[in-house]
């Protein structure tokens, strides 16, 4: 049997394997060094040398996701060359591949543009800049957690401020990248730890200790996988998940290899037939589930007719449900495997010591506030505002990385509401469930030679219960075993007592090993997951549900109003339901935020719309009870702070109110408490002297209601909320480095 890929990405189907070399990062280092002549330096090279070097670098670029002789769509959109398809494009590709190969040769160093100039002719200077900038700002080079990157990270942010909601892989990747771009960043995380759905549980004590993955576990394919790069930077060994995966029937007997092979062959043939059927059905296939089509074809072609074969067939169905974190009755027959062409090649690996080592390295040094579940996200042309409990956080932009399950539950209120197109995509996509029972035992009773083994179940409805076991003893530091629960069984798992679940899984293990004379002891410690009822996830990972398609992943990735951005595994059409997909989405959004910030900076003189969080009614209500009223001047401030530097508003009424109440002109401006006190302390009692101080001495400019809403909408929102008695405190993204000025993003 082929081993499943991971609890996040088991193979979408069981394929016949093609023999190929495993991708070895260290071997690739040696190859690059050999081809490039060691450290970068100018040296005489023959035409044959250059051709061989170019070919080698093209293969390296191919291994990390670049086409050998074409541009990526992102490169075309970025305008890296003036004309497509000509000599300039070919030259650009050679330069691009060279830069990629140089950095992949040593991912622990920050590759400088000047280093590229040492090995590329000055005739291609414009291509060096185009390729280097594209690769740098799109997260293809100089990304990750290398300690040697520190000198190249700006100490103070100058590009703007960003709030990142969620400290999972997507949020951490984006935050680190944004800091390297020069942004001020603040990460808000609802849990007490980083990682999100990547969670390494430390089990046991002094004598028996193990690190077990309760969430995402396997690095699925090293080719082009950024998590493999992080492991290299941290010098963490990777353990290849071995292919051997024996299956045991419900009586604990090893399944006959011939029968196993025959059923697997029939299963794969049916999946091939599904592809043929949906092509014939065209649009009608969008309305039918994969489970419905598979069962119809199984009966039609007489696959798995007897009870023993049916149990084997059900095991493969459970494995498919595991791969998609969803019941086959929910998966789209038309698009369930739409990401197959983008699967990363190479070995599937465990990370020695657990994935927490990657998570901790990514989180190190980031400004993260834990225990901050977000209630409301407000966004508009003036900036963004995040409400978490009794606190308000403000910034220029916000990146939301919460799981799709949280978005489906409407746990976060968006003001204004998300576009209907995006909300519809959220509703259409599926978000399924995978649960686990993690057990630490006194010894490795299952043997050292296995990383996985499977178990058949008696009934189809229960096919996903403890159907697969992962052995972590090779990488966890102790004799740990994890049982997986998929499909309908994963849903029932949520409401079953842990003691009952443990009894069932031990019964299954003792049924396998007892007849062999192997004693299965009680575990030292057991943990049962509950991802479906976790209010910070409401499930495990996404899939394409009936009525949905890969386009919905793209819609989820769309930004809103150049202020609100989205990342996470459910926002990547090519790599959904994977750890590396989440990480790559964070890099993608960091790049997008940088481009938008540059665009906004270059268009500051263009008129902007009013900050969406407040309106004229809010403004008028505030001045019904001003903090200070002096003649025609009224002042309002945030009651939660007495800081002289804190900002408020002043309203000046120009009217003939006594004669005609409708004849009133009201103008506004923003000022500090300190400035208001100067006006208040004037000896003269006339309105004219105070107005002169306001405009001439202090140099403040009066404006109409619409203009002050445009300019100070975020400030007005903060003051209004505080004056309503909501007792919220105000924090600006990157507060340690930012002035406490709510208008810093204007």
Curated annotation (Swiss-Prot):
Q: In which tissues is it expressed?
A: Expressed in the shoot and root apical regions of young seedlings. Expressed in inflorescences.
One GO process term, biological-process aspect: chromatin organization
Q: Keyword Cell membrane on this protein?
A: no
- Annotated segments matching region Disordered: 1-26
Keyword Electron transport attributed: no
Top EC category: oxidoreductase
Where in this chain does the record put each SWIRM domain? 51-152
Q: Which UniProt keywords apply?
A: Chromatin regulator, FAD, Flavoprotein, Oxidoreductase, Repressor, Transcription, Transcription regulation
Q: Which E.C. number(s) belong to this protein?
A: 1.-.-.-
Molecular-function GO term, any one: oxidoreductase activity
- Name the cofactor(s) required for activity, per the record: FAD
The record lists FAD as bound by: 189, 191, 197, 569
Query: What PROSITE patterns does the record point to?
Result: SWIRM
- Tell me, in a sentence or two, what this protein's role is: Probable histone demethylase that reduces the levels of histone H3 'Lys-4' methylation in chromatin of the floral repressor FLOWERING LOCUS C (FLC) and the sporophytically silenced floral repressor FWA. Seems to act in partial redundancy with FLOWERING LOCUS D (FLD) to repress FLC expression. Required for cytosine methylation of FWA. Controls primary seed dormancy by regulating DOG1 and abscisic acid signaling-related genes.
Q: Which family does it belong to?
A: Belongs to the flavin monoamine oxidase family.
Q: What is this protein called?
A: Lysine-specific histone demethylase 1 homolog 2
Give the organism, scientific name.
Arabidopsis thaliana (Mouse-ear cress)
């Amino acid at each position: 049997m082929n081993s499943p890929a991971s609890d996040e990405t088991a193979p979408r189907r069981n394929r016949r394997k093609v023999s190929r070399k495993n991708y070895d990062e260290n071997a690739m280092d040696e190859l690059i060094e050999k081809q490039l002549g060691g450290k970068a330096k100018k040296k005489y090279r023959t035409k044959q040398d250059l051709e061989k070097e170019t070919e080698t670098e093209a293969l390296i670029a191919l291994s990390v996701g670049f086409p050998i002789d074409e541009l990526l769509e992102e490169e075309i959109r970025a305008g890296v060359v003036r004309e497509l398809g000509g000599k300039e494009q070919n030259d650009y590709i050679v330069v691009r591949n060279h830069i990629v190969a140089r950095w992949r040769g040593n991912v622990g160093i920050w590759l400088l543009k000047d280093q590229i100039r040492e090995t590329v002719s000055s005739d291609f200077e414009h291509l060096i800049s185009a390729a280097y900038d594209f690769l740098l700002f799109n997260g293809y080079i100089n990304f990750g957690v290398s300690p040697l990157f520190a000198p190249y990270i700006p100490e103070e942010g100058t590009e703007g401020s960003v709030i990142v909601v969620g400290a999972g892989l997507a949020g951490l990747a984006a935050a680190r990248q944004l800091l390297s771009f020069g942004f001020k960043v603040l990460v808000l995380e609802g849990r007490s730890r980083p990682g999100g759905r990547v969670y390494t549980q430390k089990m046991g004590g002094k004598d028996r200790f193990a690190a077990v993955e309760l969430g995402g576990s396997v690095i699925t394919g090293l080719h082009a996988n950024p998590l493999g790069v992080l492991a290299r930077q941290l010098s963490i060994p990777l353990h290849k998940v071995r292919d051997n995966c024996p299956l045991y029937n419900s009586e604990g007997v090893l399944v006959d290899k011939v029968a196993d092979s025959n059923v697997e062959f029939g299963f794969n043939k049916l999946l091939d037939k599904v592809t043929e059927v949906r092509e014939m059905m065209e649009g009608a296939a969008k309305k039918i589930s994969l489970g419905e089509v598979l069962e119809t074809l199984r009966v039609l072609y007489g696959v798995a007719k007897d009870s023993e074969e049916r149990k084997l067939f059900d095991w493969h169905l459970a494995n498919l449900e595991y791969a998609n974190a969803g019941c086959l009755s929910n998966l789209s027959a038309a698009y369930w495997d739409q990401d197959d062409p983008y699967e990363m090649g190479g070995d599937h690996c465990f990370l020695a010591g657990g994935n927490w080592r990657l998570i901790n390295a990514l989180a190190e040094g980031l400004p993260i506030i834990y225990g901050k579940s977000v209630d409301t996200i407000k966004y508009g042309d003036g900036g963004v505002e995040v409400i978490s409990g009794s606190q308000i956080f403000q910034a220029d932009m916000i990146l939301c990385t919460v799981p799709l399950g949280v978005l489906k539950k409407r746990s976060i209120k968006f003001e204004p509401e998300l576009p209907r197109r995006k909300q519809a995509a959220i509703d259409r996509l599926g978000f399924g469930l995978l649960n686990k029972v993690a057990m630490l035992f006194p010894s490795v009773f299952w043997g050292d030679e296995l990383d996985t083994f499977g178990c058949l179940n008696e009934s189809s409805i229960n096919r996903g219960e403890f159907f697969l076991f992962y052995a972590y003893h090779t990488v966890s530091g102790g004799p740990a075993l994890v049982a997986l629960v998929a499909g309908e069984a994963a849903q029932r798992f949520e409401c079953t007592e842990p003691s009952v679940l443990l009894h069932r899984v031990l019964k299954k293990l003792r049924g396998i090993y007892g007849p062999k004379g192997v004693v299965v002891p009680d575990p030292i410690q057991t943990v049962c997951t509950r991802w479906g009822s976790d209010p910070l996830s409401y499930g495990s990972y996404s899939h394409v549900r009936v009525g949905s398609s890969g386009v919905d992943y793209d819609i989820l990735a769309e930004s809103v109003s150049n202020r609100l951005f989205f990342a996470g595994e459910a926002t990547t059409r090519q790599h959904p339901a994977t750890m590396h997909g989440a990480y790559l989405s964070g890099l993608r959004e960091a790049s997008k935020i940088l481009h938008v910030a540059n665009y906004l900076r270059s268009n500051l003189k263009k008129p902007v719309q009013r900050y969406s969080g407040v309106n004229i009614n809010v403004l008028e209500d505030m001045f019904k009870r001003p903090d200070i009223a002096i003649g025609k001047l009224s002042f309002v401030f945030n009651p939660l702070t007495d800081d002289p530097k804190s900002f408020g508003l002043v309203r000046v009424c120009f009217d003939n109110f006594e004669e005609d109440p409708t004849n009133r002109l009201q103008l506004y401006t923003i000022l500090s408490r300190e400035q208001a006190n100067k006006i208040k302390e004037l000896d003269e009692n006339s309105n004219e002297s105070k107005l002169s101080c306001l405009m001439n001495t202090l140099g403040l400019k009066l404006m109409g209601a619409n203009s002050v809403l445009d300019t100070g909408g975020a400030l007005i929102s903060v003051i209004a909320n505080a004056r309503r008695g909501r007792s919220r405190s105000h924090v600006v993204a990157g507060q340690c480095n930012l002035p406490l000025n709510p208008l810093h993003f204007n």
